[in-house]
């Protein structure tokens, strides 16, 4: 008797970006995320140089004038669209809630309503992000990184926070080989058991099948998308290139949608240990209900490599 695989039907309509409508300055101090200062004021820190620039602001390396402690300062301009205003308020609320050695720590949030600026003071990670390590890590190193990232995800998920943008650029490293989760700009706090959060946000290259397929996503595990992204990222670090497409091929939305929704999940290459191949498989199962959770993955035999 022939087995017939159920054909996946997905919504192929792409979202239309909202119009860029700018709002007057919004005071985040009056929102659900109170201003954090930890005893540090904006005048206590001095900018040293730029670490990075984005469409919404600039990240500086700064130091405390009295203690000499080094921090990263993310400065965001107040001339923002409604969507970005909500995004920033959500990020600040998550930073207020989190306190974990596996999540980049927020040291202060400063407002300048007159000039329309918000600055977020964070711990400084002197090793950059994991992008620079693609193709240059061993299984043992990956196991050590994975253990820390999964502890961070397990912590966030226990607080009902879905990150929605796990990728090498958002995982920061320091000189002690500690890896921490950063950038909560598109994250979401799940406030009800039926909250639906599999929308077109984050980096599409790391989106799970249910996030491309909005109809299927409504009934999926809201946290499982983070595990898919984690699995793609771990495999990318090992093989040295984005694993869902041939090396050198630039991912685009339509190609990724077809590969992720209709193709077979990527596998670890030949020559890897059975434990690593199994670990990747547990992360990259097409059905979200079959993917292991962060807590389950922490008990996987592959992570014994990091002990």
Curated annotation (Swiss-Prot):
Summary of the function given for this chain in its UniProt record: May function as a negative regulator of polar auxin transport. Positively regulates plant basal and systemic acquired resistance (SAR). Activates MPK3 and MPK6 in vitro.
Which protein are we looking at?
Mitogen-activated protein kinase kinase 7
Lineage runs: Eukaryota, Viridiplantae, Streptophyta, Embryophyta, Tracheophyta
Phosphoserine modified-residue sites: 193, 199
In which tissues is this gene expressed? Expressed in all tissues, with a relatively higher level in leaves and lower level in roots and flowers.
Reaction catalysed by this enzyme:
L-seryl-[protein] + ATP = O-phospho-L-seryl-[protein] + ADP + H(+); L-threonyl-[protein] + ATP = O-phospho-L-threonyl-[protein] + ADP + H(+); L-tyrosyl-[protein] + ATP = O-phospho-L-tyrosyl-[protein] + ADP + H(+)
Q: Which residues form the active site?
A: 165 (proton acceptor)
Kindly summarize what the UniProt induction comment says about this protein's expression.
By Pseudomonas syringae pv. tomato (Pst) DC3000/avrRpt2 infection.
Free-text description of this protein's post-translational modifications in UniProt: Phosphorylation at Ser-193 and Ser-199 by MAP kinase kinase kinases positively regulates kinase activity.
**Start and end residues of each Protein kinase domain:** 45-303
Q: Which residues carry this modification: Phosphothreonine?
A: 203
């Amino acid at each position: 008797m022939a087995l017939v695989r159920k054909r996946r039907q997905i919504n192929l309509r792409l979202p239309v970006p909202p119009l860029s409508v700018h709002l007057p300055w919004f005071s985040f101090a009056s929102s659900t995320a109170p201003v954090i200062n930890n005893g540090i004021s904006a005048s206590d820190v001095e900018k040293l140089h730029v670490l990075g620039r984005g469409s919404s602001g600039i990240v500086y390396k700064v130091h405390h004038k009295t203690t000499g402690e080094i921090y990263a300062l993310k400065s965001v301009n107040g001339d923002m669209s409604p969507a970005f205003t909500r995004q920033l308020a959500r990020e600040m609320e998550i930073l207020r809630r989190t306190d974990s050695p596996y999540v980049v720590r927020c040291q202060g949030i400063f407002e300048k309503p007159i000039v329309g600026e918000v600055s977020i003071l964070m711990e400084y990670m002197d090793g950059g992000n994991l992008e620079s390590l693609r193709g240059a890590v061993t299984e043992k190193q990956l196991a050590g990184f994975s253990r820390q990232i999964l502890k961070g995800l397990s912590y966030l998920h226990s607080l009902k926070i879905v990150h929605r943008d796990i990728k090498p650029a958002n995982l920061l490293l320091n000189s002690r080989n500690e890896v921490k989760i950063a950038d909560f700009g598109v994250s979401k706090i799940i406030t009800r058991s039926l909250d639906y959060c599999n929308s077109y946000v984050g980096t599409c290259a790391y989106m799970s099948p249910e996030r491309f397929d909005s109809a299927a996503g409504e009934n999926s595990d809201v946290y499982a998308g983070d595990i898919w992204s984690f699995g793609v990222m771990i495999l990318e670090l090992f093989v040295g290139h984005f694993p869902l497409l041939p090396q050198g091929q630039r991912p685009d939305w339509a190609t990724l949608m077809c590969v992720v929704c209709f193709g077979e999940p990527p596998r670890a290459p030949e020559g890897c240990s059975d434990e690593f191949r199994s670990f990747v498989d547990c992360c990259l199962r097409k059905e979200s209900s079959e993917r292991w959770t962060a807590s389950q993955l922490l008990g996987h035999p592959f992570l014994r490599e990091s002990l």
